[in-house]
Amino acid sequence: DWVCEMQHVILGAGPAGVAAAYDLSLLGHDVVICEREERPGGMLRYGIPAFRLPRNILDVELHNALRLGVQLRTGVEIGNGEGQVPMSKLESEFDAVLLATGCMAASPLPLRGEWETRDLRGIEGVEYGLDFLMQMHRGVAKTVGKRVAVVGAGFTALDCARVAARLGAAEVTIHIRTAEEYIPVTQEEIFEAKREGVRIKG
């Protein structure tokens, strides 16, 4: 087998970063993963609720992927600010730098008219779904109102609705633009959400 030993640093310990580290380790390379968060997993840990992806299962899978000698450094932020690690330092210390920083950014809602250019984060009581879920998983205490409206039709929308119900919202409604049968999630997810009191309105 052809093996070329190199020292790699991977930025991001999400699914892509961990998978790359595993494959590179199998090829005989030395691998270091730098992760901004305190624990690895990326979107799997910080964007998916534990009731949908149990953390013990996630931790076992991550352990199996990283057990080949991969070094994991958490709490590392790349940049030129105070306490950050400059990219130039990584480029000088390693043979290759792999960017696997993930998709942990909320997608803006496509609104028209006066709302088109407005940042919804500045409105009291309005949050982007991914921001809401990540804050929950980082241990930021959240409160919700008695009535919660979720706009969207994917897994993130259902996760937010189910989390809001668990936080004590008396009424949680998911508002969608299409018919329920076209929602891009599994029927099991829809069943579980409804069983927990979530309503879906098209």
Model-derived features: positions:
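Extreme N-terminal leader/targeting segments of oxidoreductases
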Residues: 1-7, 60, 123-129
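Rossmann-like dinucleotide-binding cores of NAD(P)H-dependent redox enzymes
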Residues: 33, 37-68, 161-202
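Residue-level detector of structured alpha->beta connecting loops
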Residues: 69, 94-95
